[in-house]
Amino acid sequence: MTQKVGVLAIQGGYQKHADMFKSLGVEVKLVKFNNDFDSIDRLVIPGGESTTLLNLLNKHQIFDKLYNFCSSKPVFGTCAGSIILSKGEGYLNLLDLEVQRNAYGRQVDSFVADISFNDKNITGVFIRAPKFIVVGNQVDILSKYQNSPVLLRQANILVSSFHPELTQDPTVHEYFLAM
């Protein structure tokens, strides 16, 4: 069976995720409307600005459809996408996780760091990245940076505080496809 990955495309860095999956030979659908969810098997919620993303989800009336999809299908949230999936007022509240927005600094404080994932070193690109501060016991920590979790999984949901789509390394995207 061929998988079709949806990439939420209403705000943020969705095109880089789409390009990464296409480079892996995966069919990609840019998700902008409620009916777009019906033709995908899994979804990426990209980075961007979480408050703007929430406003647009509500403006375009896709918040409920997004919630229903993410409750049962594989989903991958990067940076702002991880914030939207976590606990918080107005968020999807699907992860036993609390985040601190912009915890690694402002845009000017962006950095690149090597992190270990699945016995391999990968590059983490941190841009106004959130910090995962309260991680529930249902959440698996897959990778850390300076003792702080940066890549997590809870059941069907994968989240990263960094941007794996901004590298040439498909390791995290391949992991998501195998979930």
From Swiss-Prot:
| Its EC number(s) | 4.3.3.6, 3.5.1.2
Q: Where is the active site?
A: C79, H163, E165
One BP term from GO = pyridoxal phosphate biosynthetic process
Matching Pfam families: SNO
**Which UniProt keyword terms apply here?**
Glutamine amidotransferase, Hydrolase, Lyase, Pyridoxal phosphate
A molecular-function term among this protein's GO annotations: pyridoxal 5'-phosphate synthase (glutamine hydrolysing) activity
The catalytic activity, as recorded, is:
aldehydo-D-ribose 5-phosphate + D-glyceraldehyde 3-phosphate + L-glutamine = pyridoxal 5'-phosphate + L-glutamate + phosphate + 3 H2O + H(+); L-glutamine + H2O = L-glutamate + NH4(+)
Q: Hey, which pathway is this one from?
A: Cofactor biosynthesis; pyridoxal 5'-phosphate biosynthesis
Q: Which residues bind L-glutamine?
A: G48, E49, S50, R101, I127, R128
- Positions the record marks as coiled coil are none
Look up the record and report any one GO term of the cellular component aspect: cytosol
Q: Which NCBIfam families match?
A: PLP_synth_Pdx2, PRK13526.1
Summary of the function given for this chain in its UniProt record: Catalyzes the hydrolysis of glutamine to glutamate and ammonia as part of the biosynthesis of pyridoxal 5'-phosphate. The resulting ammonia molecule is channeled to the active site of PdxS.
Family per similarity comment: Belongs to the glutaminase PdxT/SNO family.
Tell me the PANTHER family matching this sequence: PYRIDOXAL 5'-PHOSPHATE SYNTHASE SUBUNIT SNO (PTHR31559), PYRIDOXAL 5'-PHOSPHATE SYNTHASE SUBUNIT SNO1-RELATED (PTHR31559:SF0)
Subunit comment: In the presence of PdxS, forms a dodecamer of heterodimers. Only shows activity in the heterodimer.
Supply the name of the protein.
Pyridoxal 5'-phosphate synthase subunit PdxT
From which source organism is this entry?
A: Francisella tularensis subsp. holarctica (strain LVS)
Gene name of the encoded protein: pdxT
